[in-house]
């Protein structure tokens, strides 16, 4: 059936190719752009010898051609440790400034929310992280249990008979002479 359908499709395709359009409407050159109106692209010129770019500058030849950068000016020492200067360094005064203010004042130019006494800030990233971890753990446990059950059923000869038949197989394989000697004692 599939071979016949493929043959019919092939014949139909060949028939479409052989039959020419009556008005010559299908022409591949219509789909391609005309290159007659386009100017040819200019050939890139070679860089002149007086250009600043030289690959020899990248090679280290043992001497230092680069000028040494000037040392940055040293910051002035801060005369008042309670008001840190804009030297760009971090000191103990910055730490003390953050906790030394009264209520509502969190430090210099601090823009925090004003909380009442006894009110704690919520950590917004902790709860979703814990919930996500629990969901992933439960999903993993469920998928592992399902895979275990499939494997368990795969190796049973008859899944409907269960454990009852397994006990009967054990007793059938026992040696009758051993059973007789145990019963005689």
UniProtKB/Swiss-Prot annotation:
InterPro entries: CD99L2. Residues 69-82 have a biased composition (Pro residues). The modification Phosphoserine is found at residue 168. Residues 23-122 are extracellular. One of its GO terms (biological process) is T cell extravasation. The modification Phosphothreonine is found at residue 181. Residues 1-22 form the signal peptide. One of its GO terms (cellular component) is plasma membrane. Residues 27-124, 160-185 are annotated as: Disordered. Residues 148-185 are cytoplasmic. Keywords: Cell adhesion, Glycoprotein, Membrane, Phosphoprotein, Signal, Transmembrane, Transmembrane helix. Residues 51-64 have a biased composition (Acidic residues). Belongs to the CD99 family. Involved in T-cell adhesion processes and in spontaneous rosette formation with erythrocytes. Plays a role in a late step of leukocyte extravasation helping leukocytes to overcome the endothelial basement membrane. Acts at the same site as, but independently of, PECAM1. Involved in T-cell adhesion processes. The gene coding for this protein is located in the pseudoautosomal region 1 (PAR1) of X and Y chromosomes. This is CD99 antigen.
């Amino acid at each position: 059936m599939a071979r016949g359908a493929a043959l019919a499709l092939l014949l139909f395709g060949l028939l479409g190719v052989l039959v020419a359009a009556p008005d010559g409407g299908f022409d591949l050159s219509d789909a391609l752009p005309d290159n007659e109106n386009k100017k040819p692209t200019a050939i890139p010129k070679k860089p002149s010898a007086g250009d600043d770019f030289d690959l020899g500058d990248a090679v280290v030849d043992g001497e230092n051609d680069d000028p040494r950068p000037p040392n940055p000016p040293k910051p002035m020492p801060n005369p008042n440790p309670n008001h840190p200067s804009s030297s760009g360094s971090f000191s103990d005064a910055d730490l003390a400034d953050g906790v030394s203010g009264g209520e509502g004042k969190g430090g210099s130019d601090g823009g925090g929310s004003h909380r009442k006494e006894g009110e704690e800030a919520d950590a917004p990233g902790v709860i979703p992280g814990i919930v996500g971890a629990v969901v992933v753990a439960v999903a993993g446990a469920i998928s592992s249990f399902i895979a275990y059950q499939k494997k368990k059923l795969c190796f049973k000869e008859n899944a409907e008979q269960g454990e009852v038949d397994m006990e009967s197989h054990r007793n059938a394989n026992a040696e009758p002479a051993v059973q007789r000697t145990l019963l005689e004692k």
